[in-house]
Amino acid sequence: MGTESLVHVLLVSFPGHGHVNPLLRLGRLLASKGFFLTLTTPESFGKQMRKAGNFTYEPTPVGDGFIRFEFFEDGWDEDDPRREDLDQYMAQLELIGKQVIPKIIKKSAEEYRPVSCLINNPFIPWVSDVAESLGLPSAMLWVQSCACFAAYYHYFHGLVPFPSEKEPEIDVQLPCMPLLKHDEMPSFLHPSTPYPFLRRAILGQYENLGKPFCILLDTFYELEKEIIDYMAKICPIKPVGPLFKNPKAPTLTVRDDCMKPDECIDWLDKKPPSSVVYISFGTVVYLKQEQVEEIGYALLNSGISFLWVMKPPPEDSGVKIVDLPDGFLEKVGDKGKVVQWSPQEKVLAHPSVACFVTHCGWNSTMESLASGVPVITFPQWGDQVTDAMYLCDVFKTGLRLCRGEAENRIISRDEVEKCLLEATAGPKAVALEENALKWKKEAEEAVADGGSSDRNIQAFVDEVRRTSVEIITSSKSKSIHRVKELVEKTATATANDKVELVESRRTRVQY
């Protein structure tokens, strides 16, 4: 079958590993169902993909379909200091994206591969505006939990009380969810957050929430059934995760080119079952020097084998490079390994891994649950603090090590060591493992043939196919003409438009 006959879906991603990889996982799943996927994101991230060496411009076969990449310039030099201001960058990306995306769609139509649907992730809600202007359906992939989706929804619409400057420590009671303490709700919603620009970025999606015909969630029904049932009455949500776990499509993720992917696995192969603690704080969390030292001494004192991912901060990020305690590597010898990157999915699936010290980002949370690995929670901010509460108190697969950045303290080596020992041996470790294995089984059943997530993704595929037939059978010349009109219209955007976008993003809603 030629690729021209396949339904073509355009994935538009905000740049960054935590944004691109979940959308890429969704893309390979849709490709396995017989779709042709194009993933587009700014060239600034495309350079990282090419550097990693796991990239090709040619369509890659996945199941019955294909996936390919197409990058676009965002209009700023790579070292432009304005990139550090998220409000400014999002406005610039919207200004350029509204010109570029219609051109990509126009080019596809002229090549007899018309786009039938657009899917975006958070931070770029304007993609649904582009789709609507062209008469195309759109969907959104939400890459946090349904619980966090509900929290942001209720905050945006003012449906329940949240902490305020006058009452900063009130608890939050959301329908069909456990009570959230003030430091357990997504921290960007707290009035004292040092990251108000991230609150604006996330809530921007809720302004356009009525435009996508479907909101896909990287979770599974059995994990969050009460809040999913509740929110499904309000929004067209479909849980389709865990996306990384789907057996129908091979793993395809973007990594940093820091090491050979098999290096960690070769080391783990030499360790006994359930003997290694895996430590990783994701791609955006960087700990203070003192905290790194306390974790290091805790590992030395515990005598537990470990694999520790310590990613260096990006150049010019302003984040200080941290050092391990003096003589640390010599003292641990072969009992420990420190790396800059790891193939996390493979690591968590390895039988030698006993538990996972994690920052509780949603990708890592889903990977731990679906791999059956207990966790020690070390959240910092955002949805991480909410995920940590769920892991410890609801899913019961985790031990809480800290409550987040707002706690404003260094976790001592004694506290860390105590958690490490409890999570790897004794009655608590047994209970955590039993619960973790239960969720692993539930996750596998969700993505298996006929499972809850499999049924939802099939329903989504069927709907896109149905609307695709309507689009193709309508006047193709009319469709191309509509795209051409939009391209010409957006090409007239000026620098003043960008200023208006930045100001409107900051002021149109008092988040």
Curated annotation (Swiss-Prot):
SUPFAM superfamilies: UDP-Glycosyltransferase/glycogen phosphorylase (SSF53756). UDP-alpha-D-glucose binds at Q344, H359, W362, N363, S364, E367, D383, Q384. It comes from the Eukaryota. Disulfide bonds: none annotated. The keyword Transit peptide does not apply. Its EC number is 2.4.1.210. The active site is at H19. GO terms for molecular function: limonoid glucosyltransferase activity; quercetin 3-O-glucosyltransferase activity; quercetin 7-O-glucosyltransferase activity. An anthocyanidin binds at H19, G382. Keywords: Glycosyltransferase, Transferase. It holds the Pfam family UDPGT. CDD domains: GT1_Gtf-like (cd03784). It catalyses: limonin + UDP-alpha-D-glucose + H2O = limonin 17-beta-D-glucoside + UDP + 2 H(+). It is an enzyme of class 2 (transferase). Belongs to the UDP-glycosyltransferase family. Involved in the glucosylation of limonoids. This is Limonoid UDP-glucosyltransferase.
